[in-house]
């Protein structure tokens, strides 16, 4: 048998037709030879495994970043020059650069291959063994040995080993938990009848690999194995989703490319100018060798160019970005949002569309009865409303026709019977969680809601209120037998016997029935009224009941209704309860007592969260597998829809989406707020459509089926109660499954972006200052004001601490009133870059100014400084000072550090003056500035470090420095140099205040134009 011979739609075929197509006798199974032949054709029944990416490939991938490559090149050239000049101190620079690159690569490799976790989690759902019929014998085999055509037995507690067609039921019903595929907590009823013209993704006559059998026993035929199964399709979809860079990473990469080009051109210009100047000022001599004439000057000019590259590249930027994002994840964790992927923190702040699941995210995932009704003595409807959306048993939570009633069961005999039926036709239970002070359920949500309803009706006060009425009912009635729910009759019932002494013989044995109201009503011949009287069910009664059911199940209510009835019957031994075919006859001639309507209600905080989203310019789109009417009712309650009367262009089903043209789909995703009756493929399709419109999309999900869409979205958000597969495929997990948490995370993401902009502004303006310093000294042929090692120290340590502290800046008050940033919006726009340039140029000129000030103060002329390379007598004191100007460099380095600390204060706010945005608003920044200045003083006044960084302590007598021990701490006695440092540094504050003032004026002018 070949793969092309497999039935394409086994659900639409009868069991006999499926068996014939697969060439198997379901009474005997396949023979051993047939199994072997089919294994050769179809392979083994397991999800495919791909070898992990080799470690060396992961390491190489970390060096694809432009800035990293420039640093690698700078390290290589620097190392080569250190070898040529044979100076041990010169090896410090390439060593530090390589150390940075290794750390970056280590972090990158650690974060790689997130998809493999999701794929491995998928495999955990597939069972290890299966019970199979082969050669007429029942055998237990490894699940991976199954082939199409194998006849497999499944029973309660088993996980399904492959996609199979149900061919025989060995119990009254078969129920499967398919939540890993469809995300729905309601168990799926299974049948052997074919499903033709189906609209459901998972038809009732099929069971699927990885799902669990929760009730019953059946015989099935394997139709799909391995990668061909539904779970295999999900595995393939997850694997095929490529990791895409976040918007922040893209913008940082673009910034890196731009920076690298500018650096490259400037380095070439500086190298060429310095080389030309060298040859212009150095005439060849007879004793000059080729090395001293050509190689040495080239190496020197190259060294200056490399220093310029090191100055221009913000080496600390990746570490600061990572730290800022990590701080954001900590703050998000406090709001129950657990971030698995650091860059995604900022992505959420950019998001323009949030695609949210309904159940459990927008709603409480706690089914609650909101409405119930019985009939009055005059045949009119008696309505009850119940409040509180959770499982809590709230006293006095029932109103009857607008009036609060404290003991409704004492006033309504039909309601008493309804509550008894709801409790006894029930397998769920409630218990009080002392830790959370909440009532929690065990069992189906629908049945738990009925228990809560009954307890609220009984209104029994006390510590045992959570199960008080149930205990009372179970004391009055003995449950003898249960007639399980079947899809055909849409009802279930229990046979009970009264244990109350002296009860009338006619009411000793009863059949309590609950089910679909229309089915229960169809089989009813009598009705119980609120006064306890049982009367004939007239046409008028029937009409009023149907009208009431239509009222609460339709329109904006869309409640799920359940009907209740009972029937006096014989003792259990005299009733035919063994044959499911007779269940409908047993449940006939019923007495209808009433009905209730329930709903998974919206979370109270979600409506406000959606309003915040609107204010922030974020669309909320609900994508659910629930029916359209229920989903629209929830959207109305949340304010996403104004009414359910006309939802044209706002609400679509998955089937309607499939019928659209590509143009219609594009139009739909731009206007719709709801997609109902969707399956996993629709989620994938909607994410792609939104991304095609250049919208940044966040997607929530909890099931295995959601994994591909979660991975495809710009940011996938899994529910804390969801599957491990969904969590592994996502970038964020909501511990409390709450939509309002997403909105808090969006706010945090926006704050992170603003802070990222501020520390990039700080770092880049500082780097521009360093570039200007190197550029000016290089172009004018001045001695080196700053060495590469000093630049690395400033970029990584001195600047790194304040830049990181800027991540603690408080968010702007109007942060959630701003529109989302466009995908193409750069981190740094034109005017902002101009501001960086102005500040950076001042930083550079101030550094060079301080450097020149020292020389000019000590009798050097401009000519001496610009022709210092012509010094040939290195025993001359002037030449020695020009070749190694340690004091001037110490002043230049000090000015650079102090001016950058003051510039960090400027970065507290992009546009607000320091008078408004005071330094005290970020104590971490003040601590960072203090730490950076302390570190600078340590490298200056501890001789060991001063020698390492090739500077001298300012204001300390040279003789004291010469006699000092390497680890002693020196103290300045002359502060003239430090006064100069302050004079050159402080103006940066006033310059930035002027630029902020101009920016505020420009923004006001733009606002006036808009008005």
Curated annotation (Swiss-Prot):
Residues 85-90, 279-303, 795-835, 906-922 are extracellular. Its EC number is 7.2.2.10. Gene3D superfamilies: Calcium-transporting ATPase, cytoplasmic domain N (3.40.1110.10), Calcium-transporting ATPase, cytoplasmic transduction domain A (2.70.150.10), Calcium-transporting ATPase, transmembrane domain (1.20.1110.10), HAD superfamily/HAD-like (3.40.50.1000). GO terms for cellular component: ciliary pocket; plasma membrane. ATP binds at residue 514. PROSITE patterns: ATPASE_E1_E2. The chain crosses the membrane at residues 66-84, 91-110, 259-278, 304-321, 771-794, 836-856, 886-905, 923-942. It is found in: Flagellar pocket; Cell membrane. It catalyses: Ca(2+)(in) + ATP + H2O = Ca(2+)(out) + ADP + phosphate + H(+). GO terms for molecular function: ATP binding; ATP hydrolysis activity; P-type calcium transporter activity. It is a multi-pass membrane protein. Its main location: other. The active site is at residue 357. It comes from the Eukaryota. Pfam families: Cation_ATPase, Cation_ATPase_C, Cation_ATPase_N, E1-E2_ATPase, Hydrolase. Keywords: ATP-binding, Calcium, Calcium transport, Cell membrane, Ion transport, Magnesium, Membrane, Nucleotide-binding, Phosphoprotein, Translocase, Transmembrane, Transmembrane helix, Transport. Residues 1-65, 111-258, 322-770, 857-885, 943-1011 are cytoplasmic. Belongs to the cation transport ATPase (P-type) (TC 3.A.3) family. This magnesium-dependent enzyme catalyzes the hydrolysis of ATP coupled with the transport of the calcium. This is Probable calcium-transporting ATPase. It comes from Trypanosoma brucei brucei.
């Amino acid at each position: 048998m070949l793969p092309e011979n497999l039935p394409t739609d086994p659900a639409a075929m009868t069991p006999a037709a499926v068996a014939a197509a697969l060439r198997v006798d379901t009474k005997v199974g396949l023979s051993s030879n047939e199994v072997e032949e089919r294994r050769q054709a179809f392979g083994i029944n397991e999800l495919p495994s791909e070898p992990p990416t080799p470690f060396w490939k992961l390491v190489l991938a970390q060096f694809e970043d432009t800035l990293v490559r420039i640093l690698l090149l700078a390290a290589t050239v620097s190392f080569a020059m250190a070898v040529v000049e044979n100076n041990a101190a010169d090896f410090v620079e390439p060593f530090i650069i390589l150390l940075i690159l290794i750390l970056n690569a280590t972090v990158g490799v650690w974060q790689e291959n997130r998809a493999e976790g999701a794929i491995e989690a998928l495999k955990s759902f597939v069972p290890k063994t299966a019970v199979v019929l082969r050669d007429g014998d029942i055998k237990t085999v490894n699940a991976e040995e199954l082939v199409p055509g194998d006849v497999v037995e499944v029973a309660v507690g088993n996980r399904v080993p492959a996609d199979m067609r149900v061919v025989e039921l060995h119990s009254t019903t078969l129920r499967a938990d398919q939540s890993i595929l469809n995300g729905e907590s309601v168990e799926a009823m299974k049948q052997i009848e074919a499903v033709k013209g189906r609209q459901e993704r998972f038809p009732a006559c099929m069971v699927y690999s990885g799902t669990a059998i929760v009730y019953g026993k059946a015989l099935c035929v394997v139709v799909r194995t391995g990668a061909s199964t539904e779970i295999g399709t999900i595995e393939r979809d997850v694997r095929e989703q490529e990791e895409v860079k976040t918007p922040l990473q893209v913008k940082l990469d673009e910034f890196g490319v731009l920076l690298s080009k500018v650096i490259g051109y400037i380095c070439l210009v500086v190298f060429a100018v310095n080389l030309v100047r060298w040859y212009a000022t150095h005439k060849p001599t007879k004793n000059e060798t080729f090395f001293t004439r050509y190689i040495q000057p080239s190496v020197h000019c190259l060294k200056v160019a490399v220093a310029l590259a090191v100055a221009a590249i913000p080496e600390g930027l990746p570490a600061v970005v990572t730290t800022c994002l990590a701080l954001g994840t900590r703050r998000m964790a406090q709001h129950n949002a657990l971030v698995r992927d650091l860059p995604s923190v900022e992505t959420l702040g950019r998001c323009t569309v949030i695609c949210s699941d309904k159940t459990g995210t927008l709603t409480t995932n706690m089914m609650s009865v909101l409405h119930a009704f019985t009939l009055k003595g005059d045949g009119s409807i008696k309505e009850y409303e119940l409040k509180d959306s959770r499982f809590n048993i709230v006293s006095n939570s029932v109103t009857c026709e607008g009036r609060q009633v404290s003991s409704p069961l004492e006033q309504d005999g039909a309601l008493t019977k309804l509550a008894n039926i709801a409790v006894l036709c029930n397998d769920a239970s409630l218990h009080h969680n002392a830790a959370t002070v909440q009532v929690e359920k065990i069992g189906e949500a629908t049945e738990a809601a009925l228990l809560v309803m009954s307890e609220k009706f009984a209104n029994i006060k006390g510590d045992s209120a959570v199960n008080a009425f149930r205990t009372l009912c179970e004391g009055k009635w003995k449950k003898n037998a249960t007639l399980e729910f079947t899809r055909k009759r849409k009802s279930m019932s229990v046979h009970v016997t009264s244990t109350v002494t002296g009860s009338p013989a006619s009411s000793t044995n009863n059949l309590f029935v609950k089910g679909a109201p229309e089915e229960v009503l169809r089989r009813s011949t009598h009705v119980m009224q609120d006064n306890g009287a049982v009367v004939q069910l007239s046409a008028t009664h029937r009409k009023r009941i149907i009208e009431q059911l239509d009222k609460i199940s339709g329109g904006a209510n869309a409640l799920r209704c359940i009907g209740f009835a009972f029937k006096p019957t014989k003792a259990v031994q005299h009733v035919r309860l063994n044959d499911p075919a007779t269940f409908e006859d047993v449940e006939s001639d019923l007495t209808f007592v009433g009905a209730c309507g329930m709903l998974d209600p919206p979370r109270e905080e979600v409506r406000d969260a959606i309003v915040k989203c609107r204010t922030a310019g974020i669309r909320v789109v609900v994508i659910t597998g629930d029916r359209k009417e229920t989903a629209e009712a929830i959207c109305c309650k949340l304010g996403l829809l104004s009414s359910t009367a006309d939802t044209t262009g706002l609400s679509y089903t998955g089937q309607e989406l499939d019928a659209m043209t590509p143009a219609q789909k594009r139009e739909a995703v731009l206007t719709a707020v709801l997609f109902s009756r969707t399956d996993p493929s629709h989620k994938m399709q909607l994410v792609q459509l939104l991304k095609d419109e250049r919208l940044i999309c966040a997607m929530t999900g909890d099931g295995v089926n959601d994994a591909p869409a979660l991975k495809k979205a710009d940011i996938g958000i899994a529910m804390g109660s969801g599957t491990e597969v969904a969590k592994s495929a996502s970038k964020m997990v909501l511990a409390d499954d709450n939509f309002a948490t997403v909105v808090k995370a969006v706010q945090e993401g926006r704050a992170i972006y603003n802070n990222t902009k501020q520390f990039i502004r700080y770092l880049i303006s500082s780097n521009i200052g360093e570039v200007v310093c190197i550029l000016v000294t290089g172009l004018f042929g001045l001695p080196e004001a700053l060495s590469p090692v000093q630049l690395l120290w400033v970029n990584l340590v001195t600047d790194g601490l304040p830049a990181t502290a800027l991540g603690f800046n408080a968010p702007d008050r109007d942060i959630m009133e701003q529109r989302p940033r466009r995908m193409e919006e750069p981190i740094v726009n034109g005017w902002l870059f101009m501001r960086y340039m102005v500040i950076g140029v001042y930083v550079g000129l101030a550094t060079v100014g301080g450097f020149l000030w020292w020389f000019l103060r000590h009798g050097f002329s401009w000519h001496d400084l610009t022709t210092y390379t012509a010094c040939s007598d290195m025993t001359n004191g002037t030449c020695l000072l020009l070749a190694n100007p340690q004091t001037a460099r110490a002043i230049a380095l000090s000015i650079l550090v102090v001016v950058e600390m003051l510039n960090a204060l400027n970065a507290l706010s992009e546009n607000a003056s320091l008078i408004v945005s005071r330094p005290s608003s970020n104590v971490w920044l003040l601590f960072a500035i203090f730490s950076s200045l302390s570190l600078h003083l340590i490298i200056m006044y501890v001789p060991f470090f001063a020698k390492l960084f090739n500077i001298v302590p300012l204001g300390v007598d040279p003789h004291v420095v010469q006699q000092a021990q390497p680890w002693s701490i020196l103290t300045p006695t002359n502060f003239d140099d430090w006064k100069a440092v302050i004079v050159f540094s402080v103006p940066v504050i006033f310059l930035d205040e002027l630029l902020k003032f101009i920016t505020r004026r420009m923004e006001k002018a733009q606002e006036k134009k808009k008005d």
